[in-house]
Structure formats: C-alpha cells, structure tokens
C-alpha cells in the first residue's frame, strides 16, 4: 500500500475530480499509462453498476494499460465516483494483480483546517491559507506472483506522488486553456 497527500492551491475539488474521472485522457498525461479508455456500457458488470447508483455514485468501467520499466499490464477497472469527494477504481480483471484499488479523496483545505483546529492565515501568495484542496491518493494492491511483488513494490514507491503531480499539472493546464 502506498499513499501520498498534497495540498493543491487555487483549484476546486470539482475540477480535480473531473480530471480524475476523465479516463479517456490518461494516456496523454498520466505517468506509466500507455492506454486508457472507458468501455462501452453494455460490457459493464450490471450488479456493480446497480450497487454504485444505489449509493448515489457514478459508475463506469475502463480498460487501462500500465507499463513500468520491465513489465506492462492490461486490466479493467470498475470506477465509482462520489462527486466531488472521492473516486475509487478497483481492478476487476488483471493477470499481475490479485487486487488493486486506487482511491482519490478531495477535501477543501478550509474544512481540513477547521477539523484540525487551525486558524486561517495568508499563505504568502495572496491566497488565504484555506484556499485549496487536500488531495489524498492511495494505491492498495496485492500481486499474484511473488517474483513480481518485489519489482512492483519498488516501482510503486514513486507512483503515488508522481500521479498527484501529473493530475495537478493537468488541472492547471486545463484551467489556463479555459482562461484564454
């Protein structure tokens, strides 16, 4: 299991969540992602979709291909989204991973600060210290083959922070493009 936390200033939870669920764009900006596409709805697992929509969450499935130095893996993920708080992707078909769950959580910095009893201050950039989003990213996985487990563990140490940075950069580039 690997996790990373980052404060992203000047962005909204909604904008960050939108980029995370835009799976069709992943190959253009996500490290280690060779291809990604939302699959046609008629191929989705009906029970998983029903469970998600019953909870008021969005649901879709996506095929992804990831590559890390010596190996690559194609798999399908079942994705649920509770906008704008959380996006969770669970691998439902993979040869390499027995299980893999990726979770993104987005919390307004002002909410996180008030939960911790912190007072609002200026951040030195002209923004209140509470203007931003706390992004928590977590990858929890179990590898089928013990031989591959050691290699995957080494690589995944860097994946969590690289993922957050890539998504933050994507959100900022989309925001700049929208301003033009």
In which residue ranges do the predicted regions lie?
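A conserved amphipathic terminal alpha-helix motif
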Residues: 141-180
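Short structural boundary motif marking the start of a folded domain
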Residues: 1-2, 131-133
């Amino acid at each position: 299991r690997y996790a990373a936390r980052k404060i992203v200033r000047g962005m909204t939870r909604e904008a960050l969540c939108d980029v995370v669920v835009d799976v069709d764009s992943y190959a253009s900006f996500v490290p280690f992602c060779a291809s990604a596409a939302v699959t046609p709805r008629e191929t989705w697992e009906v029970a998983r979709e029903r469970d998600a929509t019953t909870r008021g969450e969005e649901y879709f499935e996506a095929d992804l291909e990831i590559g890390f130095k010596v190996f690559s893996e194609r798999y399908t993920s079942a994705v649920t989204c509770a906008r704008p708080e959380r996006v969770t992707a669970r691998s439902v078909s993979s040869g390499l991973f027995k299980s893999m769950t990726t979770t993104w959580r987005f919390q307004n910095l002002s909410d996180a600060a008030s939960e911790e009893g912190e007072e609002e201050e200026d951040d030195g950039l002209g923004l209140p210290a509470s203007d931003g989003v706390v992004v928590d990213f977590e990858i929890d996985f179990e590898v089928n083959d013990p031989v591959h487990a050691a290699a995957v563990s080494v690589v995944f140490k860097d994946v969590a922070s690289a993922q957050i940075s890539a998504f933050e950069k994507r959100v900022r580039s989309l925001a700049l493009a929208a301003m033009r």
